[in-house]
Amino acid sequence: MRHITEIIIHCSATPEGKDFTVEDIRRWHLARKFADIGYHYVIYRDGSVHKGRAENIAGAHCLGHNAHSIGICYIGGVAKDEKTPKDTRTPQQKQALRQLVQQLQFVYPHATVHGHNEFSCKACPSFNVQTEL
């Protein structure tokens, strides 16, 4: 079992109101020469949680933090103009994210929760993780 110290929240950087799947993200990541989808979990707009990369395998979602973190991605994070960062989470996604983080913190009690933007000069996940989770 990997020693998990961080749970890192991401957005897919896709426009609000549009549905994408784990397979879509996997295809994008494979095209970028990743070994697999970079995230461990993906939360769809309807609030359903889907597994990506297995938890026992390091992700590919946050440079310098992959070895000891779990990556969660929600579908959305960009306005309809496809450029402007925006918190596009549906109420179902917000609830699912809170529940998933709670479950992971039970399994990894010493893990801290962060937004990708805390480690990289990015807007991702397009909301302030520290004030919401």
What label would you give each PLM region?
Residues 1-57:
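Short, conserved "active-site rim" segments that organize catalytic pockets and cofactor/ligand binding
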Residues 60-64:
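Short, surface-exposed beta-strand/loop micro-motifs that present aromatic residues
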Residues 40, 71-73:
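Residues embedded in well-ordered beta-strands
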Residues 1-12, 45-49, 65-68, 75-133:
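Basic/polar, cationic surfaces and motifs that engage anionic cell-wall
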